[in-house]
Amino acid sequence: MRESFLDTIQHHFGHDPVWILVVGDLMLDRYLFGDVQRISPEAPVPVVLLKSQDERAGGAANVAANLAGLGIKTRIAGVIGQDAEAETLLGLMHDIGADTQHIHCSACRPTITKTRILGGHQQMMRLDQEDAAALSAEEQLALQTAIAAALTDRPAAIILSDYAKGVLSETLCQSIIAQATASGIPVLVDPKGRDYSKYHGATGLTPNKRETAEACHVAPHDDQALLAAAEQLRHTLKLDFLAVTRGEEGITVLDRQGSAHLAATARQVYDVSGAGDTVIATLTAGLAHGLPLHDAIELANIAAGIVVGKVGTVPINKAELEQELQSQQSAAQADKVCNLDSLLARVQNWRHQGERIVFTNGCFDLLHAGHVTYLEAARNTGDRLVLGLNTDRSVSALKGPSRPVIHEQDRARVLAALESVDAVILFDEDTPIDLINAIRPDVIAKGSDYTEDQVVGGAEVKSWGGKVALIDVVPGRSTSNIIRKLAS
């Protein structure tokens, strides 16, 4: 299962000519970060000393950001104001490569902006700037015209991201669903409100547990009644599926074959903001690239488990999803054997934790005690050891046609089992200089049979403040000696 997910992400996300249209309530999320050390003398409220601020895509714009993070071409349709916040939001969308030509800029309403004030990681207050009234006839016509133009280019799928802020009226939803159905384009909806009739005929809905309970008029804690009512809702709305997101409990999917539940990946939850956006974006991306429904939902479940471990509205990205899938694929090997994107995501995470990155490289054919001792010593020069491993082709080029004895995947698997090794990446080039420049390690480790000026990447690592560490080799221990002994 994980292999098919990885294949889809690595070879299709961002490579296939697939694009997805997102329609809905576009928002700007603004975060003001500070520290709280005292209470105001003017009123019994905390004083937040502002340290930094950040602006991120929110609402339907965050759905687009998640798609872009997965490498999916994205177009956005919605309504924003003609204000500074609109310029900021458009800039964020342009930065991620999203197509904004179908966004209508209205002089009659502000850009929806949610400003959150945080002391440490604790949200103290949220300030909302919005006009949630229904669109005017002029705004509605402008948006419908823009969406019709987008549909002529046949998106692989359409996402309706409804935050009940006036954009997705029943008229607009039914118009989009009818046009999409006639063209064989799936429509997935992240719904809002108590009346889901405006989504009638959509492909699928992804409400959370509370939203499902409200729409079905049942108690959220009564699972049996909730699922029965949800299935009736699916049937009434003529949906292919209804996927109920349940936070730390995972996702329950109801379709024509019945119901199934996917448990969430256990992890610490910091912030659920935007998790629903990640679910519908990843689910739609998976379906658009040919994954079966339950596989696409499982992939979305994994992606949501990643983003809830972050503070604020932060979209998923392809590299960290690949890393998580590799981690789940095998506790021993795939957790450590990386491609470059996954490795860079992991290195970035280590750096954020203040850890020093050590890099070493070699063939490591017929692993022996000398190798193990060397790798332990290399790891001790920093906090994390990344091992660049020569592919079979490059080993043959260096050592001759009779080498390597052990296949590259087997060598990687054995090295990944060592506690001293934190990541293994194969490289096919004559030297690892491109890999070194990408990783930018703090330390390059090499055997003491080299001099510093002979170490590939030594000058580069010194140029960014790192160092070269020469590790004593164990006398008499080498793969060549082992091969000669076996031959005799």
Curated annotation (Swiss-Prot):
Species in which this protein is naturally found: Methylobacillus flagellatus (strain ATCC 51484 / DSM 6875 / VKM B-1610 / KT)
Q: Which family does it belong to?
A: In the N-terminal section; belongs to the carbohydrate kinase PfkB family.
Q: What is its EC number?
A: 2.7.1.167, 2.7.7.70
Q: Does the keyword Endoplasmic reticulum apply?
A: no
How does it associate, per the subunit comment?
Homodimer.
Residues annotated as signal peptide: none
Give the active-site positions: D277
Q: Where on this chain does ATP bind?
A: N208, K209, R210, E211
Taxonomic lineage from the root: Bacteria, Pseudomonadati, Pseudomonadota, Betaproteobacteria, Nitrosomonadales
InterPro entries in alphabetical order: Bifunc_HldE, Cyt_trans-like, PfkB_dom, RfaE_dom_I, RfaE_dom_II, Ribokinase-like, Rossmann-like_a/b/a_fold
Tell me the segments the record calls region Ribokinase.
1-332
GO biological-process terms attached to the record = ADP-L-glycero-beta-D-manno-heptose biosynthetic process
Q: What does this protein do?
A: Catalyzes the ADP transfer from ATP to D-glycero-beta-D-manno-heptose 1-phosphate, yielding ADP-D-glycero-beta-D-manno-heptose.
Q: What is this protein called?
A: Bifunctional protein HldE
* Cited PANTHER family: BIFUNCTIONAL PROTEIN HLDE
Region ranges (Cytidylyltransferase):
359-488
Q: What class of enzyme is it?
A: transferase
What keywords is this UniProt entry annotated with? ATP-binding, Carbohydrate metabolism, Kinase, Multifunctional enzyme, Nucleotide-binding, Nucleotidyltransferase, Transferase
Q: Which GO terms describe its cellular component?
A: cytosol
Q: Name one Pfam family in it.
A: CTP_transf_like
Q: What would you give as a GO molecular function for this chain, any one?
A: phosphotransferase activity, alcohol group as acceptor
Which catalysed reactions does the entry list for this protein?
D-glycero-beta-D-manno-heptose 7-phosphate + ATP = D-glycero-beta-D-manno-heptose 1,7-bisphosphate + ADP + H(+); D-glycero-beta-D-manno-heptose 1-phosphate + ATP + H(+) = ADP-D-glycero-beta-D-manno-heptose + diphosphate
Q: In which pathway does it act?
A: Nucleotide-sugar biosynthesis; ADP-L-glycero-beta-D-manno-heptose biosynthesis; ADP-L-glycero-beta-D-manno-heptose from D-glycero-beta-D-manno-heptose 7-phosphate: step 1/4; Nucleotide-sugar biosynthesis; ADP-L-glycero-beta-D-manno-heptose biosynthesis; ADP-L-glycero-beta-D-manno-heptose from D-glycero-beta-D-manno-heptose 7-phosphate: step 3/4
Among Gene3D superfamilies, the record links this protein to: 3.40.1190.20, HUPs (3.40.50.620)
